A protein has these predicted regions:
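Alpha-helical scaffold segments that flank or form the walls of functional sites
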Residues: 86-139, 163-182
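C-terminal cap of metal-dependent C-N hydrolases
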Residues: 341-343, 347, 360-406
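N-terminal metal-binding scaffold of metallo-dependent hydrolase/deaminase domains
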Residues: 1-52, 65-66, 371-377, 391
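Active-site gating loops and adjacent loop-to-helix segments of metal-dependent hydrolytic enzymes
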Residues: 76-97, 106-109, 135, 139, ...
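Histidine/acidic residue-rich metal-binding segments in metalloenzymes
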Residues: 128, 167-263, 277, 286-309, ...
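His/Asp/Glu-enriched, well-ordered alpha-helical/loop segment
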Residues: 216, 286, 290-373
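Histidine/acidic-residue-rich catalytic or RNA/ligand-binding cores of hydrolases
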Residues: 81-84, 126, 195, 231-237, ...
Length: 409
């Protein structure tokens, strides 16, 4: 043991009935993956992969499928919609948020997520966690983050850091970059329609100034923009990524496609009744349920428009499989949806040269699921093996879960 992580033999081979490599290619049957340290050095049929003597060999049951680690493209480390009145918990002390982030990250890892994009956190909890992972103090996914996300005081965003002016937002962006932010984020619109309209809390001039400030710092910029004029103003300003886009219209879809703008789909908050029931506001609970049909319709259009899309769980901890299932329900093939949640997600994070697919030279971020996701994509909920950087984490996570259960008795 080194820290909390089990270090495998220098070379490890995994044999599987099938491998879905994340590129969209036809799955390999009766296949093997060879890992040296934390790097994949070969992948192919068992006959084509030469396994050196002394290699540790993991042979998966015939009913399991080997895949790349999944990528959660929109996550808030300390947020969990499955906690009662969770919106009040975001105001807890930062030390408590950090502890909650540990639990959330462990659940996400166990669901097969090995890379995460964080879209607003308080107290630099995300950066502290990333440092703790790098130092071997905790186990966790690969993290790319905007650190704090900003909103105008008059605006929406319960995890947003409030600012009173564009100048204050510029200073906040600069502080984020100095602290270690990989990209930047601000909040523009609300989340649900109000009287059939989507409120926007920033003017076109303010949005343009914010986008320019981020780009001047050499960072891409993501925006919480759900629909309406606010989303169009973001596209006019040249944002790099739209988060959520629940009510994106046909014109916006065409503009996003033309500009190569990303859309990160986070369908769960409109469709997960368990999560919705934990909201304190009856009005918000009703709005989320009432607006489901329109969200399904608009996101289905976007998914089928050949946009650059990724998926995220937002605060629905451990539910990445639900987002992949939503893509399939909207018309994607299972193979395409898996690519979105692996290689495509890695492209969004800017790590596709090292993660997102099972290819030679990439990091050994590997999971297995019980079943064949090409026949039934919902089996992605049944994650067995979890490996990040060639280190097997599922056994540790299961042991920690057992200890937690014993402690609670």
């Amino acid at each position: 043991m080194v820290g909390l992580v089990t270090v495998l033999a220098m070379q490890t081979a995994i044999k599987a009935k099938r491998i879905v490599d994340g590129t969209g290619a036809v799955p390999l049957e009766n296949a093997a993956l060879l890992i040296d340290g934390n790097v994949i050095i070969d992948v192919g049929t068992e006959e084509s992969v030469r396994i050196p003597e002394g290699t540790e060999v993991i042979t998966l049951p015939d009913n399991e499928t080997l895949l790349p680690g999944l990528v959660d493209g929109h996550n808030h480390p300390s947020l969990c919609w499955y906690l009662k009145n969770f919106l009040t918990l975001v105001n807890d002390p930062h030390e408590h948020l950090f502890l909650r982030a540990i639990r959330n990250f462990h659940i996400n890892l166990r669901s097969g997520v090995t890379s995460i994009r964080c879209l607003a956190e308080k107290g630099y909890v995300d950066l502290l966690y990333r440092r703790a992972v790098e130092e071997g103090l905790v186990i966790g996914p690969r993290i790319k983050t905007c650190t704090r996300g900003f909103r105008f005081e008059r605006g929406h965003g319960f995890l947003g850091t409030p600012v009173q002016s564009v100048e204050e937002l510029r200073r906040g962006f600069a502080e984020n970059v100095k602290a270690g932010a990989d990209f930047l984020k601000f909040f523009v619109t609300g989340t649900v329609l109000v009287d059939r309209e989507m409120p926007s809390f920033m003017s076109q001039v303010e949005i343009q100034a914010a986008v320019d400030a981020a780009h001047d710092l050499g960072k891409e910029v993501a925006v919480h923009a759900v629909g309406g004029q606010g989303l169009h103003d973001c596209l006019s300003a040249g944002v790099d990524c739209i988060e959520h886009g629940y009510f994106v219209d046909d014109e916006a879809i065409a503009r996003m496609k033309g500009a190569g703008c990303w859309l990160v789909i986070t369908s769960g908050i409109f469709f997960d009744d368990e999560a919705i029931d934990n909201l304190h506001s009856r009005e918000l609970r009703e709005a989320l349920r009432e607006q489901r049909p329109l969200v399904r319709e608009t996101l289905t259009k976007a998914i089928n428009a050949d946009l650059k899309v990724a998926v995220g769980t937002d605060g629905l901890v451990g539910k990445i499989a639900d987002e992949i299932c939503f893509l399939v329900a909207a018309g994607m093939t299972s193979l395409e949806a898996i690519r979105v949640a692996t290689l495509q997600g890695a492209r969004l994070l800017g790590i596709d040269d090292e993660a997102g697919s099972l290819e030679r030279g990439k990091r050994a971020d590997v999971i297995s699921v019980v079943g064949n996701p090409l026949e039934d994509v919902s089996v992605l909920e049944n994650v067995h093996l979890v490996m990040k950087d060639g280190q097997r984490l599922d056994l540790i996570l299961d042991q920690m879960s057992t200890l937690d259960e014993r402690a609670m008795k």
